[in-house]
Amino acid sequence: MHCPFCGTQDTKVIDSRLVADGASVRRRRECNHCKERFTTFETAELVMPRVIKTDGSREPFNEDKLRNGLLRALEKRPVSLELMEQAINKIKSSIRATGEREISSNFVGSLVMENLKQIDKVAYVRFASVYRSFEDIREFGEEIARLND
């Protein structure tokens, strides 16, 4: 790997450890030429399937859309960003585990709901109200009743 300080290719790894629940490797490196030290992070680059939207159009999986949807549902709720990131990683792992090249947006939505139900029931109902297009208060009540079952 090139040294970011002097540009030499001659660097060595002096320490490696797993981070982010084993999803990444943090490496401390040292340049053999200028002796500067720096940190790199290594993660597997995995291709996510395309998402088939309800109107039939297709688009690449967008992690930012997933994160924003979770942030909206979890807004002002006592849930840490770390817990939310874990949910994002679980959802992405479930999507990858299908082995499919394309998945439906409904499948993604159901994974989000499944994870929100485990994290925060209020956020789950918030997300469900948008995802399922609740029309009136009765539908909220029915969803809350299903939570208690």
Curated annotation (Swiss-Prot):
Negatively regulates transcription of bacterial ribonucleotide reductase nrd genes and operons by binding to NrdR-boxes. GO terms for molecular function: ATP binding; DNA binding; zinc ion binding. Keywords: ATP-binding, DNA-binding, Metal-binding, Nucleotide-binding, Repressor, Transcription, Transcription regulation, Zinc, Zinc-finger. InterPro entries: ATP-cone_dom, NrdR-like_N, RNR_NrdR-like. This is Transcriptional repressor NrdR. GO terms for biological process: negative regulation of DNA-templated transcription. It holds the Pfam family Zn_ribbon_NrdR. Residues 49-139 form the ATP-cone domain. It comes from Idiomarina loihiensis (strain ATCC BAA-735 / DSM 15497 / L2-TR). It comes from the Bacteria. Belongs to the NrdR family. Binds 1 zinc ion. A zinc finger (unnamed) spans 3-34. Its cofactor is Zn(2+).
